[in-house]
A protein has these predicted regions:
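Active-site cradle of extracellular carbohydrate-active enzymes
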Residues: 214, 218, 226-275
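CBM-like carbohydrate-recognition segments
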Residues: 48-101, 105-140, 202, 263, ...
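Lectin-like carbohydrate-binding module/patch detector with strong preference for beta-trefoil
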Residues: 396-534
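Oxyanion-binding "anion nests"
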Residues: 269-282, 290-301
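Bacterial Sec-dependent N-terminal signal peptides
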Residues: 2-5, 22-54
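Extended ligand-binding groove/face enriched in aromatic
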Residues: 115-220, 224-231
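Short coil/turn linking the two alpha-helices of tandem helical-hairpin repeats
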Residues: 106, 153-157, 218-222, 279, ...
Length: 534
């Protein structure tokens, strides 16, 4: 099996040729270290909220072009072709990379049509690649399979995707985690399935991809076994494949503890995303520091004149995982002022070098995309991903992690430390706990999703009930209108937070009792309806 995506290169040499807009083994011990009229139509609301909108830039055109060039979608069957000139569906791990780009678009937009597309893409993929997957000895393949599926579950709610993502992770982790060599780690390719003469090692690709899957499985199930697995894998990577001084993620380590210190942008990106997930799940700032250090390594060492680019013919994707890792880190931690200009520099180079007939750009972001209809579909996924995470204008500070505090009494919105669907949302004295941390992400219509970092459930109006006094609850994220919120800056610097479906505002009933219910109520402009985002 030829693994072009996984071909190992010494990027001490490659980095010299990188162009366009990112050893020592360590101890196994982890370091410590204006009010608006609630009767406005949805269209009018969209116009009111433009100051908070994450502008799409060229993201819509890029995804539309990607689909025009490669997507086959008919009668519920959907797949990406191997190339423009091909009629054959992309398969296995490469198809997973294609689908991840579509999931990036849905993450940005919340578009119901893209949600349906993702459901059809993954359903078709499972029909073409049914489990069991024990025939595939490459554990990172299973990582990409499972990553596309678990993201798809979080977006569509299709339980079959969760079932198969769990199967994929558990199968690869149970067979791949080995303590005989290197004190742990997941084999890149199972030794007993590796042809004679091929390398046997434990790679960043297999460990980062499966570690990310474990994080998303934990978010989806709250099964602490997955969090323990994610932490175990991460600690091993940190000790064996991560340079904590520079932020470089090494390629792999073999049975004799020989480390391939070659670098790849996708390895950096997977690690960054992984670290950021663990930071959000645990609150441990060391994960944040690791992620930022690895972003800065790419920015300072793996670009030419600021641009990330690689036109190597053997590659499938190059910058897609970095786009996700950087995009999530910057959005969730409100780091736009630090990285936005660099993100836009790359976005502009991507767009300037696109094929204008399809609006698609290959991995070489600093040079014109060839008009070659035989180039693999996955070569164009990284540009699509980057544009989904780079808004057309620098966002304000609403997006990201916040504690939501009442301007009236200083008490915080709290999920009651509950992981149960339908549990009522309450107020509690600010304490810095995960039950009081909420991630704000935006939809294309400029509304906001508000997700608990404790339960990974969404702030929700039960059944879209518009009655004044209805207690708000938490529910599995669906991005339905009863989970979409307008977040409007007021003249005093506070925010009005009101529901798209009901127009009811987040309200504390002018009560300062710990544990008291938070409700919705029609806007009256009182201090009980004004909130600070910390």
């Amino acid at each position: 099996m030829e693994k072009k995506y996984l071909k190992k290169i010494n990027t001490a040499g490659l980095s010299i040729g990188l162009i366009v807009v990112t050893a020592t083994l360590f101890s196994s011990c982890k370091k410590t270290a204006q009010p608006t009229d609630p009767q406005l139509s949805n269209a009018a609301k969209s116009n009111v909220h433009t100051e908070n909108t994450v502008a799409p830039g060229n993201a819509d055109a890029a995804f539309s072009g990607y689909n025009s060039a490669f997507l086959v979608n008919s009668g519920g069957t959907a797949y990406y072709k191997q190339s423009i000139s091909s009629s054959t569906a992309d398969g296995t791990w490469v198809a997973s990379l294609d689908i991840l780009a579509a999931e990036d678009d849905y993450e940005r937009t919340g578009d119901p049509a893209t949600k349906t597309l993702i459901n059809n893409l993954l359903t078709t993929w499972l029909q073409n690649t049914p489990p069991p997957w024990t025939w595939d000895g490459w554990n990172d393949d299973i990582g990409w399979f499972s990553l596309a599926l678990i993201r798809g579950y979080q977006m569509t709610g299709n339980n079959n995707f969760l079932t198969e993502a769990e199967y994929g992770f558990n199968m690869a982790f149970s067979r791949g985690w080995d303590t005989q060599y290197n004190g742990g780690g997941i084999w890149e390719q199972q030794p007993n399935m590796t042809p004679a003469g091929q390398a046997i090692n434990k790679a960043a690709l297999s460990n980062n991809s499966l570690g990310k899957v474990a994080c998303l499985l934990y978010q989806s199930t709250l099964n602490t076994t997955y969090l323990n697995d994610a932490t175990q894998i991460y600690n091993w990577i940190w000790a064996h494949l991560y340079n904590s001084s520079t932020g470089l993620v090494y390629a792999d380590i073999d049975e004799n503890n020989n480390v391939d210190m070659g670098s790849a942008v996708y390895n950096q990106g997977s690690f960054i995303d992984y670290a950021n997930y663990l930071y959000e799940i645990t609150g441990n700032v060391n994960y944040y520091n690791d992620a930022k250090r690895s972003i800065d390594y790419v920015k300072n060492n793996m670009t030419t004149n600021g641009i990330i680019s690689n036109d190597a013919s053997y590659l499938n994707t190059w910058g897609d995982e970095f786009a996700r890792g950087l995009g999530h880190f910057v959005r969730d931690n409100r780091m736009w002022s630090t990285y936005y200009s660099w993100m836009m520099q790359n976005a502009n180079s991507i767009w300037a070098n696109r094929r204008t007939d399809y609006n698609i750009t290959w991995n070489g972001w600093n040079e014109p995309t060839p008009s070659d209809n035989t180039l693999a579909t996955s070569k164009f996924a990284s540009a699509v991903a980057w544009l989904q995470f780079t808004p057309g204008a620098q966002p304000d500070n609403i997006a990201g992690e916040h504690v939501i505090v009442s301007a009236q009494n200083g008490i915080a919105v709290d999920n009651g430390s509950s992981t149960t669907n339908g549990n009522g949302v309450i107020q509690w004295g600010e304490n810095g706990g995960l039950s009081q941390k909420w991630i704000f992400t935006q939809n294309e219509d400029s509304s906001w999703n508000i997700i608990s970092e404790d339960s990974w459930l969404a702030l929700d109006v039960p059944d879209g009930n518009a009655a004044n006094g209805t207690q708000l609850d938490q529910w599995t994220p669906t991005r339905a209108t009863n989970q979409r919120w307008w977040v409007d800056l007021q003249s005093d610097g506070t925010y009005k937070i009101w529901n798209q479906a009901t127009s009811g505002c987040l309200d504390n009933s002018s009560n300062s009792t710990n544990g008291y219910k938070l409700i919705e109520w029609g806007w009256n402009g009182g201090a009980n309806q004004r909130w600070e985002l910390q």
